[in-house]
Amino acid sequence: MKKRAVYSIIIIMLVFTSCTIGGSFYMLNFSLTPNAKILSKDADSYPYMYRNYPFLRPWVDSLKQVNALKDTFIINPQGIQLHAFYIAAPAPTSKTAVIVHGYTDNAIRMFMIGYLYNRDLGYNILLPDLQHQGESEGRAIQMGWKDRIDVLQWMNIANEIFGDSTQMVVHGISMGGATTMMVSGEKQKPFVKCF
């Protein structure tokens, strides 16, 4: 009887451990490599933004009309091609914002924050697509840790695009906020003023 109870406990523990390990790997795979239905696509992002933030349509249309909404690409140290949009301020300025999106989003879905910085505050803005999101390549979402290196590279690119005397703020939402805080722990260039 005692032997049977010990075997039952061992079997229950093995089943529980197997379920925990299997579930952990499933959730890890689901979180880092979500299927196409979960990731925000560029084609779906514009209608989403216009529906939820109607004030964006005239601004984005005017930017496109005068070719002020620009794309740029870089290759990160791991050889992954990354994408970003950038928009110069309405009047020349050294103030620049790098705006980092959240989990499964893309740069387009940060246009409402870009509008605030660019149109209302008069900043130059750069909106990167993090790895495996938007138009950027990558095998998996990095949850901010590896993205911090990419954002540091984007900060240097923004400084080159908008002039070498920039005063830069780095702003992130959700996972982009976590990425921004990870960036803040790295050695910063003098042009970075706040996070």
Describe each PLM feature range:
Residues 141-162:
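Alpha/beta-hydrolase active-site loop
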Residues 103-117:
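The serine-hydrolase catalytic nucleophile loop
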Residues 1-17:
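N-terminal Sec-pathway targeting helices
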Residues 15-74:
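An N-terminal hydrophobic leader/cap segment in hydrolases
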Residues 117-137:
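Conserved alpha/beta-hydrolase
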Residues 94-102:
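Short beta-strand element of the alpha/beta-hydrolase
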Residues 157-161, 166-195:
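Primarily recognizes the serine-hydrolase "nucleophile elbow" in alpha/beta-hydrolase
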Residues 77-88:
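A short loop-to-beta-strand scaffold at the N-terminal edge of the catalytic core in hydrolase folds
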